[in-house]
Amino acid sequence: MTRDEIVAIFQKTGAMLSGHFRLTSGRHSNRYFQCALVLQHPDYSELLCRELAARFAGDGISVVIGPAMGGIIVSYEVARALGVRGLFAERENGVMTLRRGFSIEPGERVLVVEDVITTGGSVREVMEAVRKSGGTVAGAGVLVDRSNGAVDLGVRTEALLTAEVVSYAPEDCPFCKQGIPAVKPGSRKI
């Protein structure tokens, strides 16, 4: 898929939002990628995640995992495309962990996926959970990298769409200074 084709899907589904947003990282931005609006469409989910999976097809991946919430559908669809298990990690007492009977065997090659990254914090937390389980993090895949490739996760990282989106510390946010309230559209409470 070309970048233009991917952008067209995000635009068609209304997933590229403008306004004043408080991101999961705690930073503020005037743009937000609401991947749930794309992922609600099974055909688009399959198409995008198949493209992401293809980038790791020869890497011997045996498990795909993503953080709840944003990574659940991505994990499932990428795993399906690769023909492997798809898991998700979730927070328990504030720590990303494997629950619900999910496990990773020592030495399994694991691909960590997410819908959007800004700082990579959630992906790093899942990577730590994988390592604690004895798995080997073989790579990371995301639908959207808001950092335009600036985030270094320490493993090969593939993004379907990279975008340089300005974000601000809350104390430096021009929208806050104008009194414009921030919206928190994501799933994680901060």
From Swiss-Prot:
EC id: 2.4.2.10
One GO term of the biological process aspect: pyrimidine nucleobase biosynthetic process
Enzyme class: transferase
InterPro entries: OPRT (IPR023031), Orotate_PRibTrfase_bac (IPR006273), PRibTrfase_dom (IPR000836), PRTase-like (IPR029057)
Glycosyltransferase recorded as keyword: yes
Residues involved in orotate binding: 118, 146
Pathway terms, separated by semicolons: Pyrimidine metabolism; UMP biosynthesis via de novo pathway; UMP from orotate: step 1/2
Cofactor(s) the protein requires to work: Mg(2+)
Annotated GO MF terms: magnesium ion binding; orotate phosphoribosyltransferase activity
Top-level division of the source organism's lineage: Bacteria
Disulphides: none
Pfam families in the record: Pribosyltran (PF00156)
HAMAP family for the chain: PyrE
Assembly behavior: Homodimer.
Protein task: Catalyzes the transfer of a ribosyl phosphate group from 5-phosphoribose 1-diphosphate to orotate, leading to the formation of orotidine monophosphate (OMP).
Protein family per UniProt: Belongs to the purine/pyrimidine phosphoribosyltransferase family. PyrE subfamily.
Entries under NCBIfam families matching the protein: pyrE_Therm
Protein name listed in UniProt: Orotate phosphoribosyltransferase
Source organism of this protein record: Pelotomaculum thermopropionicum (strain DSM 13744 / JCM 10971 / SI)
